[in-house]
Amino acid sequence: MTNIPVYLYPQEYAAENGELDKYRLSRKLNLACKEAIEQAIGAHYSENRLDTSAAVKQVADAFGYERTLYVLAITVQHKGHDGRISDANKDWAMSVPIFEDRIDGSADNNRFLVVDKVNPGLVDLFVRGTRRAQAQEKEQQAERAKSKTAEKPSILEKLKRPVQRNSPNNSANFLEPEL
């Protein structure tokens, strides 16, 4: 499920552009992700403490960070009035482009993606934990990519090296004739 991209556009756009299948699949996964977030928070909340890293890992492993953060951005945007959501998370959520998903003036269909079966304070912790985990994963990926490129010389470096001619004078197996 993590390899299926989030479809960002509203249903009306998808219908006009022949992409309803992509829209429907993405929406189905978004709803499942929302439910998984609610379930993970409930499962990892005990004795007034949320095991944020375990809850985030459970959802991110199943749906990926892109979809998880998309659903969380919708949630925070819809709960912008709630004081239990931090200003930092509200600012982040407002920076994520979310299209309204209305058909013929109806209410925004994104309201069905709002994580609302758990306390907003716990949602705030989950959002912060997810953003942090994604940043750490990006750092690790960058370090792995950097170490891979450090191990292998670039093709440009290979091309800059002087050419070694393959001649008898340079050959290790060349024996000078005895005189």
Please tell me what each predicted stretch does.
Residues 1-178:
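Gram-negative host-targeted secretion-system effectors, predominantly Type III and Type IV
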